[in-house]
Amino acid sequence: MPRNAVKPLAALCVLALPLTACGGNSAASDENVVTVYSADGLRGENGDGWYDQVFEDFEKETGIEVEYVEGGSGEMVQRAVREKRNPQADVLVTLPPFIQQADTKGLLQKYAPKGVDRVSGADKAANGTWTAVVNNYFGFIHNKKELKHAPTTWEELLDGRYENKLQYSTPGVAGDGTAVLIKAMHDFGGEKQAMEYLKKLQANNVGPSASTGKLAPKVDKGELLVANGDVQMNYAQSKSMPNLGIWFPAREGGKPTTFALPYAAGLVTGAPHTENGKKLLDHMLSQKAQQQVSEIGGGFAARQDVKATDANALALTRLMDGVEVFEPDWDDIEENLTSYVDSWKEATGN
């Protein structure tokens, strides 16, 4: 079935990141439009992702057309900051700590979507400005064809076989790239120890990437052996990229670890189509859309009352078995993100 929810014009906008909305004022003057700025990962490579289905259903039910712009988590927040005096987006979807950053910068207004009471308190803002719409976890990917056995530790990645065959997205720009710092600081026991490791890893690192989603095709083709990612995005990508395998690094002698990295959505302050934005957020948290999170998107429902039992949900449960889930101090990370990224730049020379 053809999916036309993602408009070519909107998709092209992210390349230039202008200060005004795509298509000038035409979108803003059209009352049957809602504009979404989102971190990448929820749109399918072949039009078969969660966003593709959710936006199509929403358009059919409401007659409201979804204009969609995607990029790195930090990239989308930075764009919204530049447009703050003349907002172009109605809904912002990004990952921690960037959703907290957006809130701190006054980019989000309070709105409680229908069904938000079914979302865990840890997965939504206490002040009511954002909520998770898809739960997710940080992870790494490897090429299963070239590496019959996935690496298991951070230390293995320092081996010479990974020289120019390893890449992770840019901390401070990409949500999953920032997650590399968060997990390394947790696993190695602090900022200093993590930066010492990442300095060593730089010998094998191809270089920066603003988008995590663009790394998976390189891993699937064997251009890279290892990259960072997240469970939802990479599991969905593996349907069309058969060489992708998901794994979670451990310290040598330790357990593999990960942490929740939900796609969180909020209504933009001064949104040009506030009511349409509210309707879309309601739809994203509806029982139907939440049931589709695992069925179609390969992720985890944000609503606690949605118990997925489909094949994808069972496979995801097996994937997470034995992996220790820790909870980052998001307030600390949001407050000190610039400092952590600066330390990373100094350590790696990026």
Question: Predicted regions span which residues?
Answer:
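A bilobed periplasmic-binding-protein/Venus flytrap-type ligand-binding module shared by bacterial periplasmic
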Residues: 139-146, 181-185, 260-274, 292-296
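Extracellular/periplasmic bilobal clamshell ligand-binding domains
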Residues: 311-350
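Periplasmic-binding protein-like
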Residues: 136, 198-201, 208, 242-269
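Conserved N-terminal structural module of periplasmic/extracytoplasmic solute-binding proteins
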Residues: 8, 25-91
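Extracytoplasmic ligand-binding site segments that recognize negatively charged/polar headgroups
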Residues: 37-51, 71-75, 87-223, 256
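A ligand-binding cleft/hinge motif common to bilobed small-molecule-binding domains
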Residues: 97-103, 220, 225-245
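Mature extracytoplasmic/periplasmic domains
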Residues: 268-324
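Short, low-complexity disordered leader/linker segments with a strong preference
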Residues: 1-35, 350
